[in-house]
């Protein structure tokens, strides 16, 4: 790991507000939490509800954390697309984002690295698509009411090789 960037709960609203509202189509219905949304119905994520939407899960379902992860990945794809679009229009946008949250994050990334990473993304000629990968495996209800995830060891090993290993000739 070359760098790390851990976002505190307090950073979600400023980051969301900076890119503007994002409309998502939830993959499940959540009604009993601090935020309510319905499966298949458009839901607008704002600074006020971003953290709650990303945190919410149906605690009665064994697959609750997997469904939440799917929502989080969908959100991250839409968020990054908006952030990249804003960066193409304003090259200082990534630094502005960084400055909004630098006091509420844990990171070893500085402004120089933010600028470098943004320039790497903008070098792409076509639309930039960030890849998100998910570890294959099985989720079961464990002791008590906790869900337990067991990765497919072979698939995990192959994924690590695909992502981090390149054969030199």
Protein language model regions, located:
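Flexible, polar/acidic helix-loop-strand segments at domain edges
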Residues: 11-100
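A short linear-motif detector with a strong N-terminal bias
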Residues: 2-4, 31-33, 109-114
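Structural recognition of the beta-strand scaffold that forms the well-ordered cores
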Residues: 2-6, 52-53, 131-134
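A general secondary-structure junction signal
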Residues: 8, 28, 134-136
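C-terminal solvent-exposed extensions
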Residues: 45, 106-169
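Second-shell loop/turn segments in exported
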Residues: 1-3, 58-67, 83-88, 100-108, ...
């Amino acid at each position: 790991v070359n760098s790390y960037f851990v976002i505190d709960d307090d950073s979600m609203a400023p980051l969301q507000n900076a890119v503007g509202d994002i409309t998502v189509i939830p993959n499940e219905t959540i009604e009993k939490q601090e935020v309510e949304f319905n499966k298949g119905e458009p839901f607008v994520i704002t600074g006020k509800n971003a953290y709650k939407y990303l945190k919410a899960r149906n605690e009665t379902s064994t697959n609750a954390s997997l469904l939440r992860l799917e929502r989080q990945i969908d959100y991250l794809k839409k968020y990054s697309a908006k952030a990249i679009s804003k960066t193409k229009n304003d090259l200082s946008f990534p630094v502005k984002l960084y400055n909004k949250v630098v006091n509420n994050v844990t990171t070893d990334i500085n402004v120089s690295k933010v600028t470098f990473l943004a320039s790497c993304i903008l070098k792409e000629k076509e639309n930039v698509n960030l890849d998100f990968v998910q570890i294959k495996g099985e989720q079961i209800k464990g002791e008590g009411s906790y869900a337990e995830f067991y990765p497919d060891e072979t698939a995990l090993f192959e994924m690590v090789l695909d992502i981090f290993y390149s054969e030199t000739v």
